[in-house]
Amino acid sequence: MTLEIFEYLEKYDYEQVVFCQDKESGLKAIIAIHDTTLGPALGGTRMWTYDSEEAAIEDALRLAKGMTYKNAAAGLNLGGAKTVIIGDPRKDKSEAMFRALGRYIQGLNGRYITAEDVGTTVDDMDIIHEETDFVTGISPSFGSSGNPSPVTAYGVYRGMKAAAKEAFGTDNLEGKVIAVQGVGNVAYHLCKHLHAEGAKLIVTDINKEAVQRAVEEFGASAVEPNEIYGVECDIYAPCALGATVNDETIPQLKAKVIAGSANNQLKEDRHGDIIHEMGIVYAPDYVINAGGVINVADELYGYNRERALKRVESIYDTIAKVIEISKRDGIATYVAADRLAEERIASLKNSRSTYLRNGHDIISRR
């Protein structure tokens, strides 16, 4: 598609797009700020080999809007934004590049706070931190929360229990058969919680070592990647690639609940409508996997793990609220999640509007 930038920004109510260029380091980046009604915009920095500049802009805009909804639904006083860097993260990175980006972020004076994302690391965030305080997910020695995977997993576990309560009348997962697609960092910690509660696990992953670890530690059964959709199970937990709920997989599903850590689980919105009509309880991805962003957001107030985990625990209540809206309004849960986020933003729109205050009033609480 041909991107008419201002027409697009107006249509979806974006506030700002910043183009960042540094000739010496080769930095080419886009910072997209979607909405700051709730507070400064928080969203990660992604580095990717985009096919075109237009594709990079579109990705930044799409991801920024997604962060607005994720942060709002999570109850955070933060808006949504995203940075994308055009380049190959395996060979194009340099200290100069990330320091240049840090200066651009500093120039926004706290309207935008970044974190790591696909293609970037904690080390990259540490370099950005040399130029600005408006970055989270840095090394623990700087007061960071460290690896977010265990906290994200705990949030998914809590959200899964809320979805199970709706589907089975109880949130007790003991004896429930749960098919976990992908056994990476987040899913491994999710499996720990599920195994501890007495759930029976079926796992798959293209990484055979990860599968073997789950088999040995949790007594899981292993299947091939293309077999996971059709297994007899109570809950399907997509924790790897996105778009796994689609025309090909839906007819195979035997689960009554879909709840996992993967992003963009529905290939298209209509797939959310289809599973809703089938009576499958779907825990919307950006609500159930918000533990990571809740965790890093806590760094802005001086990281307290107990406080962060308590907030992540409330993902149970958020999923329950989404299900309540779904039933009340007769809509699919993915629509209900959007409605929950939009209602929260709208309730504060008149009183707060665009965030233009000096960001140090938040970041200084570290």
Swiss-Prot record:
Keyword Oxidoreductase in annotation: yes
PROSITE patterns: GLFV_DEHYDROGENASE
Top EC class of this enzyme: oxidoreductase
Keywords for the protein's UniProt record, in alphabetical order: Branched-chain amino acid catabolism, NAD, Oxidoreductase
EC number: 1.4.1.9
GO biological process per UniProt: L-leucine catabolic process
InterPro entries listed in its UniProt record: Aminoacid_DH-like_N_sf (IPR046346), Glu/Leu/Phe/Val/Trp_DH (IPR006095), Glu/Leu/Phe/Val/Trp_DH_C (IPR006096), Glu/Leu/Phe/Val/Trp_DH_dimer (IPR006097), Glu/Leu/Phe/Val_DH_AS (IPR033524), Glu/Phe/Leu/Val/Trp_DH_bac/arc (IPR016211), NAD(P)-bd_dom_sf (IPR036291)
Active-site residues from the entry: 82
Binding, NAD(+): 182-188
SMART domains: ELFV_dehydrog
Protein name: Leucine dehydrogenase
Role of this protein: Catalyzes the reversible deamination of L-leucine to 4-methyl-2-oxopentanoate.
Family classification: Belongs to the Glu/Leu/Phe/Val dehydrogenases family.
Matching Gene3D superfamilies: Leucine Dehydrogenase, chain A, domain 1, NAD(P)-binding Rossmann-like Domain
One Pfam family matching this protein: ELFV_dehydrog
Signal peptide positions (record): none
Catalytic activity field: L-leucine + NAD(+) + H2O = 4-methyl-2-oxopentanoate + NH4(+) + NADH + H(+)
Pathway(s) annotated for this protein in UniProt: Amino-acid degradation; L-leucine degradation; 4-methyl-2-oxopentanoate from L-leucine (dehydrogenase route): step 1/1
GO MF annotations, alphabetized: L-leucine dehydrogenase activity
